[in-house]
């Protein structure tokens, strides 16, 4: 007789080899055919809403590993919330305007911006943006991200632009929008102003120069200290040589001590506490302090500009520190925020001798036409000729750069439009406190940024963007903006999009009969566009308030930690300014993706991990599993080695699911399920461990701690299941009669475990959970077309059975000692497989009573025979001694012959005439099977 045919061996067509790169696209196609996004929304329609508002990625180029991580995290949130019964639509968006697209159009398409009119150039930009959106949309879908991909929100949509104009108009109406001449971050390469969020800091090598400004008027303060002023100088220090031509003042701190310090024949005015530092940096020799004054005593003195022989007045400023330099700060009001503010106090001109391309104008005689960076050498030579260059050297320091072109930027005073953050700063700080920040340090970070930030420069000198909806009177030059003009522009954009601004005249746009206060009816349009952060920062109004599936405020904004100064902040500012509160209730941030050694990814280092390549090699589910493999609130490491490890963990999880499926091939959950009371104790223990997993994942996911998925699920599958419960269960599943109560108890437990596990996996392992679901049989109340339509598992109180937990946890702990004893016997060649063994247990009285509470310990220990000795019996001298329990163990070869069917050794093998090669237990099972 072929006894193999009498065993209930696993059967499943669920493949062992995942082959995800091939299988996942097939699953995606099925999701599209069933319109899974709408199906999920219909299921939860009318229930409590949970809105995660998508921060729009920039429509430019392929997605990178950080973008992939961000989208997967969002998808996990939304899928979890829908399984918890929330109506949780996900409307993805794209940021479509701005400089990067202009640059790509010029670079890739070879477009010459200045040879095209704005309308033509904008059309090329729009077409490029749409091509990038389609490219990224397919990449996001390939990650398994579920969303309204056919109707995303785009910042270039006419409806969106109209709503953005409304936000701008409301801020203007409340007095928060103004035009002013101010030093702003300026990129000469891109020829535009930049917001703080568009600045990155990189190390830069610059000049470090000490410059002498001879005193022209000391207000009589130095009389009697020096004979005359011909050799008395204020000494300044700067790392921006090119700003010297724009110097109009020298700033001192009113409370610092400043010394007239004699070095040789010259007297230098330096902060007393910086004299030694200056001496060291300049190589000056011995000195003598002639006198010391408070900074405020020197206010109003005049020095001579070393190049132009004009006055450079001495002013006071609290911004002057002793961190570096001389305590005398070179002040060019047209080139620095603090310089500008001090200059305003003293009525100084915001002199800006540099044009939008970075070249000196005729306001800097002698340097006209020189690029600012190239002028450094000439300026230093002129200072040297004037005997004003005290010392120079090169230093490396952190310097602001344009985030797009990576060029160094400069501060440049120009006329710009600003949002006055000062007008609603306190409201914004209050709103921050009302939001839940994950991790908690995010609150302090954005609080500091908002508290310390300057007014927001919102104008850009480009054409691909939303125009600033302001008109100027051609007669008096006064700007025109009111409810009437804003409504006219808003409605125009709603109908025709913002291209209309560039296609129509002011007269065609403005309502008929509108006049300036001066009486003129002739107007021209503003030519600047809005900062792209104003675009995306208006999404709460343009999307949350207008989309029929969404609501304001959102439950969650989830982006990288750099967005505290970006989208989180621009959204907060526009919302507080117009609605008085934050547009979000919760904000979660993740770190950046770095390589396996914690280094930033870069092409030059060759350490870039491309998500497309990961998907091609391993599949999207392995990438998704990586996303939850570590605490993503810090920087996340990835590398080929790390991904290989993740793929191995995935394989183990998949194998566990395959084992469960394989042993449920003949199980019908509607007919074969047993009630909890009829399960064996070990089955109840397995359900306790499952229940613990449900509880842990639910609590963690509720707190957005999705990294708590990886290790618990891995441990449950590998340790609790594969290495323990499922290993023990094999005998009952394979050798017992197919319809026996014992086997049905095991299958009931396996079904509950699989049904629960596949649902727990669904938000993370989107494709694999679906593949498992489609291979499962389901009970009539659970027979959904997709696992995404199923409910999240509930914690079952009855599974937390204290008696079962305590008893079986202790036995499995003791089982570790049994395994150690078996391993020693194996190493001593006493046994091969554990089923070759007989285990003799010599326990204490207490443990003896404990062991008597179990039947068939041989199946738990996976040996052929267990002999429990009386506590009075003495164990052999060579017995294994447990370190944790009062227990000794011996291992010998089991008596009897090996059963051909169950592979256990038994003295009953050969005693059954009809079945001479199998044990009595197996013979009994076969006879029982034949009766069915």
Curated annotation (Swiss-Prot):
Signal peptide: none
Cofactor: record remark: Binds 1 zinc ion per subunit.
Keywords from the UniProt entry: Aminoacyl-tRNA synthetase, ATP-binding, Cytoplasm, Ligase, Metal-binding, Nucleotide-binding, Protein biosynthesis, Zinc
E.C. no: 6.1.1.5
Keyword Ligase applies: yes
Residue numbers covered by motif 'HIGH' region: 57-67
Transmembrane spans: none
Residues that, per the record, bind ATP: 603
GO-annotated molecular function: aminoacyl-tRNA deacylase activity; ATP binding; isoleucine-tRNA ligase activity; tRNA binding; zinc ion binding
Gene Ontology terms describing biological process: isoleucyl-tRNA aminoacylation
Superkingdom, taxonomy of origin: Bacteria
Location within or outside the cell: Cytoplasm
Chain residues that bind Zn(2+): 899, 902, 919, 922
Positions annotated to bind L-isoleucyl-5'-AMP: 559
Matches recorded under InterPro entries: aa-tRNA-synth_I_CS, aa-tRNA-synth_Ia, Anticodon_Ile_BEm, Ile-tRNA-ligase, Ile-tRNA-ligase_type1, Ile-tRNA_ligase, M/V/L/I-tRNA-synth_anticd-bd, Rossmann-like_a/b/a_fold
Keyword Transmembrane helix: no
Cofactors, names only: Zn(2+)
Function: Catalyzes the attachment of isoleucine to tRNA(Ile). As IleRS can inadvertently accommodate and process structurally similar amino acids such as valine, to avoid such errors it has two additional distinct tRNA(Ile)-dependent editing activities. One activity is designated as 'pretransfer' editing and involves the hydrolysis of activated Val-AMP. The other activity is designated 'posttransfer' editing and involves deacylation of mischarged Val-tRNA(Ile).
Family matches, as HAMAP family: Ile_tRNA_synth_type1
Domain notes: IleRS has two distinct active sites: one for aminoacylation and one for editing. The misactivated valine is translocated from the active site to the editing site, which sterically excludes the correctly activated isoleucine. The single editing site contains two valyl binding pockets, one specific for each substrate (Val-AMP or Val-tRNA(Ile)).
Family: Belongs to the class-I aminoacyl-tRNA synthetase family. IleS type 1 subfamily.
NCBIfam families: ileS
Protein name per UniProt: Isoleucine--tRNA ligase
Organism: Caldanaerobacter subterraneus subsp. tengcongensis (strain DSM 15242 / JCM 11007 / NBRC 100824 / MB4) (Thermoanaerobacter tengcongensis)
């Amino acid at each position: 007789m072929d006894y193999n045919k009498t065993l209930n061996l696993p059967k499943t067509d669920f493949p062992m080899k995942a082959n995800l790169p091939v299988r996942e696209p097939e699953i995606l196609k099925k999701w599209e055919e069933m319109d899974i996004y709408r199906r999920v929304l219909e299921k939860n329609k009318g229930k409590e809403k949970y809105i995660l508002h998508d921060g729009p990625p920039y429509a430019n180029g392929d997605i990178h590993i950080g973008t992939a991580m961000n989208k997967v995290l969002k998808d996990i949130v939304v899928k979890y919330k829908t399984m918890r019964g929330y109506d949780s639509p996900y409307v993805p968006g794209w940021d479509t305007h701005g400089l990067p697209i202009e640059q790509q159009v010029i670079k890739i398409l070879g477009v010459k911006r200045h040879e095209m009119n704005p309308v033509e150039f904008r059309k090329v930009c729009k077409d490029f943006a749409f091509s990038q959106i389609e490219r990224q949309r397919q990449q996001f879908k390939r990650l398994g991200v579920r969303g309204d991909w056919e109707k995303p929100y785009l910042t270039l949509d006419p409806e969106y632009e109209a709503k953005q104009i409304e936000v701008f108009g409301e801020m203007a109406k409340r007095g928060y929008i103004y035009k002013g001449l101010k030093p702003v971050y300026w990129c000469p390469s891109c020829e535009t102003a930049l917001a703080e969020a568009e600045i990155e800091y990189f190390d830069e090598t610059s000049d470090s120069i000490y410059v002498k400004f001879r005193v022209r008027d000391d207000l009589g303060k130095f009389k009697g200290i020096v004979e005359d002023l011909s050799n008395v100088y204020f000494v300044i220090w700067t790392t921006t040589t090119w700003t010297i031509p724009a110097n109009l003042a020298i700033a001192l701190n009113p409370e610092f001590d400043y010394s007239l310090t004699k070095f040789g024949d010259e007297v230098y005015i330096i902060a007393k506490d910086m004299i030694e530092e200056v001496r060291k940096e300049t190589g000056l020799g011995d000195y003598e302090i002639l006198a010391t004054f408070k900074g405020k005593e020197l206010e109003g003195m005049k020095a001579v500009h070393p190049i132009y022989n004009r006055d450079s007045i001495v002013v006071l400023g609290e911004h002057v520190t002793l961190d570096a330099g001389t305590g005398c700060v070179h002040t060019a009001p047209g080139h620095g925020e603090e310089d500008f503010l001090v200059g305003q106090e003293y009525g100084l001109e915001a002199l800006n001798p540099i044009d939008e391309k970075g070249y000196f104008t005729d306001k800097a005689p002698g340097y006209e036409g020189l690029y600012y960076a190239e002028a450094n050498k000439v300026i230093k030579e002129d200072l040297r000729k004037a005997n004003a260059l005290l010392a120079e050297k090169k230093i490396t320091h952190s310097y602001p750069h344009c985030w797009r072109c990576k060029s160094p930027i400069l501060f440049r005073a120009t006329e710009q439009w600003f949002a006055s953050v000062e007008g609603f700063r306190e409201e914004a700080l209050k709103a921050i406190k009302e939001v839940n920040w994950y991790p908690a340090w995010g609150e302090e970070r954005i609080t500091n940024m908002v508290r310390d930030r300057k007014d927001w420069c919102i104008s850009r000198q480009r054409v691909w963007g939303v125009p600033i909806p302001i008109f100027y009177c051609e007669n008096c030059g006064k700007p025109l903006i009111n409810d009437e003009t804003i409504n006219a522009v808003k409605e125009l954009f709603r109908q025709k999009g913002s291209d209309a601004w560039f296609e129509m005249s002011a007269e065609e746009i403005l309502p008929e009969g509108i006049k300036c206060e001066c009486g003129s009816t002739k107007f021209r349009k503003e030519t600047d566009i809005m900062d792209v952060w104003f675009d995306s920062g208006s999404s709460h109004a343009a999307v949350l308030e207008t989309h029929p599936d969404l609501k304001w405020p959102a439950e969650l904004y989830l982006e990288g930690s750099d967005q505290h100064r970006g989208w989180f902040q621009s959204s907060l500012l526009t919302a507080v300014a117009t609605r008085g509160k934050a547009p979000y209730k919760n904000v979660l941030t993740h770190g950046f993706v770095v390589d396996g050694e914690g280094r930033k990814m870069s092409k030059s280092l060759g350490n870039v991990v491309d998500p497309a390549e990961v998907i091609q090699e391993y599949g999207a589910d392995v990438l998704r599993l990586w996303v939850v493999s570590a605490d993503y609130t810090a920087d996340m490491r990835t590398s080929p080695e790390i991904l290989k490890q993740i793929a191995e963990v995935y394989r183990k999880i998949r194998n566990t699911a395959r084992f469960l499926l394989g042993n449920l091939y003949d199980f019908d959950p509607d007919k074969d399920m047993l009630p909890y009371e009829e399960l064996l104790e070990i089955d109840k223990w397995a359900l306790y461990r499952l229940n613990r997993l449900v509880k842990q994942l639910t609590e963690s996911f509720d707190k957005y701690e999705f990294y708590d998925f990886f290790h618990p699920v891995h441990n449950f599958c590998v340790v609790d299941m594969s290495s323990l419960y499922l290993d023990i269960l094999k005998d009952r599943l394979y050798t017992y009669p197919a319809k026996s109560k014992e086997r049905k108890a095991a299958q009931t437990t396996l079904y509950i475990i699989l049904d629960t596990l596949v649902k727990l996996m669904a938000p993370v392992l989107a494709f694999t959970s679906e593949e498992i679901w489609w291979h499962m049989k389901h009970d009539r109340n659970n027979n959904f077309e997709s696992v995404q339509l199923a409910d999240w598992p509930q914690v079952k109180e009855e599974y937390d059975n204290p008696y079962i937990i305590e008893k079986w946890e202790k036995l499995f702990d003791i089982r570790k000692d049994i395994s150690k004893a078996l391993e020693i016997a194996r190493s001593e060649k006493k046994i091969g497989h554990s089923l070759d063994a007989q285990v003799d247990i010599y326990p204490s009285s207490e443990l003896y009573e404990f062991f008597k509470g179990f039947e068939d310990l041989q199946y738990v220990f996976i040996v052929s025979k267990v002999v429990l000795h009386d506590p009075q019996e003495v164990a052999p001298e060579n017995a294994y001694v447990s370190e944790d329990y009062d227990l000794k163990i011996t291992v010998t070869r089991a008596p009897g012959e090996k059963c051909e069917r169950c592979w256990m050794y038994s003295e009953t093998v050969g005693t059954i005439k009809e079945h001479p090669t199998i044990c009595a237990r197996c013979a009994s099972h076969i006879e029982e099977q034949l009766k069915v």
